[in-house]
Amino acid sequence: MGDWGFLEKLLDQVQEHSTVVGKIWLTVLFIFRILILGLAGESVWGDEQSDFECNTAQPGCTNVCYDQAFPISHIRYWVLQFLFVSTPTLIYLGHVIYLSRREERLRQKEGELRALPSKDLHVERALAAIEHQMAKISVAEDGRLRIRGALMGTYVVSVLCKSVLEAGFLYGQWRLYGWTMEPVFVCQRAPCPHIVDCYVSRPTEKTIFIIFMLVVGVISLVLNLLELVHLLCRCVSREIKARRDHDARPAQGSASDPYPEQVFFYLPMGEGPSSPPCPTYNGLSSTEQNWANLTTEERLTSSRPPPFVNTAPQGGRKSPSRPNSSASKKQYV
């Protein structure tokens, strides 16, 4: 086993930008895979080739049978599995680091532009472009990047790749070795002169270790699938919330209108069928009554004697004359 310190540090940084299920997956990867394999793997599989014995004295037959029984060592196969399964996570970590550095550069550039004493149109456009780019990088209050936008796409792709690689390595282990370690391996391969029986050391202990690593691999695969479901539900809930907020904005705007719309009731101007007619005097309408009053007044005026008229009025003023009949008609009509 090599030094896993560098890989552990990288995956520890990924844990800060992962979901709850992703953190559990990292815990399973560290404790139940890397540490146990590093501590117990060498002691269990260290004598794999040295204690592989065959009942023949033919030179080279034991090595050929060992190559047929174990095309690749279990330890090396699991190491390759860890490296391949961890690679998508490392790619996601690279995306996180890239976005973090980009966000820092944008903030630094924004500070330099805002510090300028005079701001022309080009500076305002540059600030607007920087704000638009920073809006795509969602940063939490504690400084961590939120899994949204392009980062969400990278995270989903990494989880999918981990699931496919995990399932592929589990299938490959089953095709190469099976799920148990047989104590006797029958070999018939040149340069062996005949069918040779070869014996494996501590087969029961190795079988237990194989089953343990198999269970851990299945748990890791299930966690990856659960994380995909978690991400899908998270995206759907966020989309539903965004639609609700979008639908609620017009209602809130109408409620805060300082001049709300009022409802007025309009009564018909015409007379309804149940409204009583206007009262009349002596069966006459108002216009006919006015004409009758005017005619009566003219008759009374013609029957009176004419008033005394001064030929030379004092002060040069004329006495006001009575309005003529046309003016009276206009008055009463």
UniProtKB/Swiss-Prot annotation:
SMART domains: CNX (SM00037), Connexin_CCC (SM01089)
Keywords: Cell junction, Cell membrane, Gap junction, Membrane, Transmembrane, Transmembrane helix
Oligomer status and interactors: A connexon is composed of a hexamer of connexins.
GO biological process: blood vessel development; cell communication
InterPro entries, A to Z: Connexin (IPR000500), Connexin37 (IPR002263), Connexin_CCC (IPR019570), Connexin_CS (IPR017990), Connexin_N (IPR013092), Connexin_N_sf (IPR038359)
Organism name: Mus musculus
Localization per record: Cell membrane; Cell junction, Gap junction
Tissues expressing this chain: Highly expressed in lung.
Region of interest called Disordered, as start-end residue ranges on this chain: 292-333
Function of the protein: One gap junction consists of a cluster of closely packed pairs of transmembrane channels, the connexons, through which materials of low MW diffuse from one cell to a neighboring cell.
Extracellular side stretches: 41-76, 172-208
Residue stretches spanning the membrane: 21-40, 77-99, 149-171, 209-231
Protein name (database record): Gap junction alpha-4 protein
Chain ranges on the Cytoplasmic side, renumbered to this chain: 1-20, 100-148, 232-333
